Curated annotation (Swiss-Prot):
This is UPF0316 protein LBJ_0597. The keyword Cell membrane applies. Its main location: membrane. Signal peptide: none annotated. Belongs to the UPF0316 family. The keyword Membrane applies. Coiled coil: none annotated. It is found in: Cell membrane.
C-alpha cells in the first residue's frame, strides 16, 4: 500500500503529523527569532525568519489543499500551541544574552559583593535607603546562563535577600577574559561570520 494523498492513512495520520511537527518547528524558530531580535542579533534573526516563513508556507499549502480534513486544522492549531511552549523552553535552555542582577540587602551587601567578586563577577555597589532603613545595593551584569550560579552564591550569604533580574538588551565587552559575564561569539554567529 502506497502512502499518497487520497490514501486514508496518509490523509488522516501522516499529513496531520507532518503539519503538527512542521508547525512546532516553525513556531519554535519564531520564538527564538524574536528573542534574537531583542538581543540585536539581526543577521541570525533574519536567517531564522526566512526558515520560519518557508516552513509556514509549506504547512499552510497542505492545510489549504485539505480543507475537508478537520485533523489538519487541529494539527495546525496544536502545532502552534506546542511550538510556543517548546520555543519558550528552548529559549530558557539557550539563555541568550545578559541580565542585570540587582540585590538589595539591609545586612550583608558588602559580603555578597565580595563573594560575587571572588567568583569572577564584576560588581558595583551603592548605598541606598529602604523603607526600614539603610541598604546596600549590589549590581552585576552577567550571562543569563550564570544566573543560577550567582544566585547560589548570593543565597549562601543571605537566603531571604531581595533581588530582581532584568534583561540587558546590550552590553559592551569591557569585562575581563575570565569573567562569567564576558560576551563570546556563539557557534551560529561563527558559522555565519556575523559582525555588528
Amino acid at each position: 500500500m502506497e502512502l499518497n494523498p487520497g490514501n486514508p492513512i496518509f490523509d488522516y495520520c501522516v499529513l496531520p503529523c507532518f503539519i503538527f511537527l512542521a508547525r512546532v518547528t516553525d513556531v519554535s524558530i519564531g520564538t527564538i527569532r524574536v528573542i534574537l531580535l531583542t538581543r540585536e542579533k539581526k543577521v541570525i534573526a533574519a536567517s531564522l525568519g526566512f526558515l520560519e516563513v518557508l516552513l509556514w508556507v509549506i504547512v499552510i499549502t497542505q492545510v489549504i489543499k485539505n480543507l475537508n480534513n478537520a485533523l489538519c486544522y487541529l494539527a495546525y492549531a496544536g502545532g502552534f500551541a506546542a511550538g510556543t511552549f517548546i520555543g519558550m523552553i528552548l529559549e530558557e535552555k539557550l539563555a541568550i544574552g545578559f541580565s542585570l542582577l540587582r540585590i538589595i540587602s539591609p545586612r550583608n551587601g558588602d559580603e555578597i559583593a565580595n563573594k560575587l567578586s571572588e567568583a569572577g563577577y564584576g560588581v558595583t555597589t551603592m548605598n541606598g535607603q529602604g523603607s526600614r532603613g539603610p541598604v546596600k545595593i549590589v549590581f552585576t551584569v552577567l550571562k543569563r546562563k550564570k544566573i543560577g550560579q550567582a544566585m547560589t552564591i548570593v543565597k549562601s550569604v543571605e537566603p531571604d535577600v531581595f533581588y530582581s533580574i532584568e534583561n540587558a538588551r546590550s552590553t559592551n565587552t569591557a569585562v575581563s577574559e575570565d569573567s562569567p559575564g564576558l560576551l563570546r561569539i556563539g557557534i551560529l554567529e561563527k558559522i555565519l561570520k556575523v559582525r555588528k
